[in-house]
Structures are given as structure tokens and as C-alpha cells.
């Protein structure tokens, strides 16, 4: 199995998939971020190179986030050998294009036991793109806790900060759809930290969740 992504935001997804399919010696490929590639490339480039092309969508496709659904992406979704998604809300949208779309939940992959304990000098760690919704929570939390907002795609830097943190906090970017950010939190599973997420419409990973108003008192 081969793996391709369009952005470092998919790094943890790719690592999870590599672990899951480590014994798969096929010439198939799983593509994350096809909505990006499809703006400038034809899927034919990949279909010629690989035996099977699997498009793994992870972008929210509810009514308020249709910017990801453009003609090029429609073509990719129609022509891919398989289409996967990790959220049932997206599945219902994708069924309009691909009735055979498959639900694929990410699986924990990281062995945190190999890391030596360090001093927990960070109360709350957050990383991810910022918007008004996320800033509002983080600014309030800063009044009571030592909050670190990390801006890095370097896995070693991220792991170092995770080990130093008491709480790993996930806040929805697209809070209207409240889809669980598996692509971020899958790295956290098994870490020596308390994981807290803003409440999702469905808790696939079984993490601790709180309503928006409750996040201010973690």
C-alpha cells in the first residue's frame, strides 16, 4: 500500500494508515487531500501508476462547508476505485456521488510507552488553525491556566509538547457540523495526558468530551 497527502495536516492520518496496512504489499494508493490535488491534476495520473486509487476524504461536507466540493473533486470522487470517509455525516453527502463510499475510522498507532516522563509544565496544549470560535475559548482559558498554542508540523516538536502537557485540548474549527477531528486526536490516544474535546455529534474515538460552555472549566 502507498500513501500520498497534500498537506502536513494529514501526517497523523498517514501514520495511522501506514501502521494499519504495514503488511499490505499491494500497488494500491490511499490519497488524503484529493480536494487539493484535483484542482490542478487529473486522477488519471494516479490510476496509471497504481492498481487501485482510494480517495480518503476528511474534509467536512455539510451544508456550511461546501467549498471543498468543486468540479475537479467531483470528477475524482466519481473515478476513484474506492472512496473512504471517517464520519457518517460526510458519508451521507458522499453517497449522492458514490453510493459505495466506505466508513473508515482511524486507528491508534503511536507507542507512547517509549517516551520518558518529563515535568508537566504546560496546563493546556492546543495546536491547529485558529478562528474566532477557537480563539474565544483559548483566550478565556489563558486567564486561569498556562495555555500553549503550538504552531508546528514537526512530529518531534509536537511530541515534546505533548509529554509536557497535562491536558490536550481539541476545539472544533467547523463547530456547526461538530465532526470529531480524528486526524488530530488519533496521535494523542495512549499519551500520558488528559484528552478533552469539544463535544462532537459522534464520539468515534471515545475521548472525554465537553460542551462549549464547559470547556472554560476543565
Please tell me what each predicted stretch does.
Residues 1-26, 31-48, 54-214:
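Nucleotide-sugar donor-binding catalytic core of glycosyltransferases
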Amino acid at each position: 500500500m502507498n500513501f500520498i497527502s497534500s498537506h502536513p495536516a494529514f501526517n497523523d492520518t498517514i501514520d495511522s494508515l501506514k501502521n494499519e496496512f504495514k503488511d499490505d504489499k499491494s500497488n494500491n494508493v490511499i490519497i488524503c487531500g484529493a480536494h487539493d490535488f484535483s484542482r490542478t491534476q487529473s486522477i488519471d495520473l494516479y490510476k496509471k501508476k497504481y492498481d487501485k486509487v482510494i480517495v480518503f476524504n476528511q474534509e467536512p461536507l455539510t451544508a456550511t462547508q461546501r467549498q471543498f466540493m468543486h468540479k475537479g473533486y467531483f470528477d475524482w470522487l466519481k473515478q476513484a476505485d474506492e472512496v473512504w470517509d471517517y464520519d457518517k455525516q460526510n458519508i451521507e453527502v458522499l453517497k449522492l456521488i458514490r453510493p459505495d463510499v466506505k466508513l473508515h475510522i482511524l486507528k491508534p498507532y503511536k507507542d507512547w510507552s517509549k517516551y520518558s516522563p518529563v515535568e508537566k509544565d504546560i496546563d493546556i496544549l492546543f495546536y491547529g488553525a485558529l478562528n474566532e470560535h477557537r480563539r474565544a475559548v483559548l483566550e478565556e482559558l489563558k486567564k486561569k491556566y498556562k495555555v500553549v498554542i503550538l504552531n508546528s508540523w514537526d512530529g518531534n516538536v509536537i511530541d515534546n509538547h505533548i509529554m509536557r502537557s497535562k491536558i490536550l485540548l481539541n476545539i472544533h474549527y467547523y463547530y456547526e457540523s461538530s465532526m470529531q477531528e480524528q486526524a488530530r486526536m488519533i496521535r494523542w490516544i495512549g499519551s500520558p495526558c488528559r484528552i478533552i474535546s469539544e463535544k462532537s455529534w459522534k464520539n468515534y474515538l471515545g475521548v472525554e468530551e465537553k460542551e462549549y460552555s464547559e470547556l472554560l472549566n476543565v
